[in-house]
């Protein structure tokens, strides 16, 4: 039997049985939910509604990093031979943030055959002056990230890969979370969010990684924090940034050394990356 026809018959049988057991209103409600998930993907579960993003943009309209009331977060991103498609998607995700409290620090170690990386970044710099860039010698992921940190002017730092995407409300949400921690008298040195994996479009993630609140034993076993992690630049400076001898697990090593100073990390339960 055709797989789709078999599936359709199974769904029809389920609908009939559900109507008998729980009534027509319940069946219609569950059916509507099924259609929404099938036709519109998982976006509603991972990203805020359009009106929420519009409200954030309206709140921040006409404001700069200096007067928006949110802590400035400098995003550290080493570039290396980044494909144009991924680079543009990443830069677009920064330019289109709902709040202006982000700074994007790019350290480009691309080889001579990928000079277009610099050209593309310079194109985006004309759109957004909060993108800073420098060309560097390739010394590995940790050293290249440290080079990006030398460009940072923010009170906080974040790590982002050159072929990933920030959720449109990432900087706004992290900035608000920091302010909330301060208002509650809680430590604000280290925060992390949930994240989603996707292939072709951020609108249709394949799976989300919903993380637990700070779990020290789990962190010792694996880097469950990953992205998006935000931490005070003063802490980064104190521990000396990332260690080149830990290339390949440099972020995990960094986070373990950070929590030695902060005694934990605050979980922001939203998909921001």
PLM feature segments, named:
Residues 157:
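Short aromatic/hydrophobic "clamp" motif used to bind/position activated sugar donors
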Residues 169-205:
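Conserved donor NDP-sugar-binding/catalytic core segment of glycosyltransferases
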């Amino acid at each position: 039997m055709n797989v789709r026809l078999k599936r359709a018959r199974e769904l029809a049988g389920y609908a009939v049985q559900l109507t008998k057991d729980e009534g027509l209103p319940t069946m219609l409600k569950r059916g509507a939910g099924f259609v929404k998930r099938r036709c519109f993907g998982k976006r509603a579960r991972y990203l805020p509604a359009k009106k929420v993003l519009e409200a954030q943009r309206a709140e921040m309209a006409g404001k700069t990093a200096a007067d928006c009331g949110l802590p400035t977060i400098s995003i550290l991103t080493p570039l290396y031979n980044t494909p144009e498609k991924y680079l543009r998607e990443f830069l677009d995700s920064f330019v289109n943030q709902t709040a202006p409290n982000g700074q994007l620090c790019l350290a480009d170690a691309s080889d001579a055959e990928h000079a277009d990386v610099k050209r593309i970044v310079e194109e985006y710099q004309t759109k957004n002056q909060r993108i800073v860039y420098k060309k560097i010698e390739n010394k590995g992921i940790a050293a290249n990230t440290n080079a990006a940190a030398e460009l940072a002017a923010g009170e906080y730092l974040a790590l982002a890969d050159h072929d990933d995407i920030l959720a449109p409300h990432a900087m706004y949400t992290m900035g608000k979370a920091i302010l909330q921690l301060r208002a509650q008298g809680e430590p604000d040195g280290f925060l992390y969010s949930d994240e989603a994996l996707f292939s072709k479009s951020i609108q249709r993630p394949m799976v989300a990684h919903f993380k637990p609140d700070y779990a020290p034993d789990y962190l010792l076993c694996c880097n469950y924090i990953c992205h998006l992690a935000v931490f005070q630049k003063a802490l980064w400076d104190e521990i000396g940034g990332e260690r080149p001898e830990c290339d390949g697990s440099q972020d995990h090593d960094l986070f373990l050394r950070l929590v030695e100073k902060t005694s934990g990390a605050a979980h922001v339960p939203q998909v921001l990356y």
